[in-house]
Amino acid sequence: MEKTKQQSNKDIVLEAFDTLFNKRDYAKAERFWSPKYVQHSAHIEPGREGLFNLVKSIPATLKYESSLIVAEGDFVILHGRFSGIGLPVNWIAVDIVRMENGILVEHWDVIQDEATKKQSKSKLPMFGSSFPVYAKLENTIG
């Protein structure tokens, strides 16, 4: 069975994120991101180099996991977790990527700190089926 454009785009984005964030293979990652990559995130300098430089500045413990991915037209939306980022907490992110001819060309995101069970009013985890445990913070965060 032939893949749809949307399935192909999802597969490409997942491979791109794994290659850059988890494997840190910058040479291979260049083939996924356009040299004219447009970055809308308030956390990241402009362009592909801005993104790559951000990843280079984060500890090698960085890990990206995706729990949901949806594609519509040229857009791919991911719900994911960035852990090991050198901060006391993980980040939960929704990333929106626009694709052109199998290349990531534009990006938006919404990022927030991952809440512990003690912090969560809903008592439901923000990612996956369990809450994170932040040893240094669990006793101090209300």
Model segments located where?
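C-terminal and inter-domain tail/linker signature
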Residues: 1-142
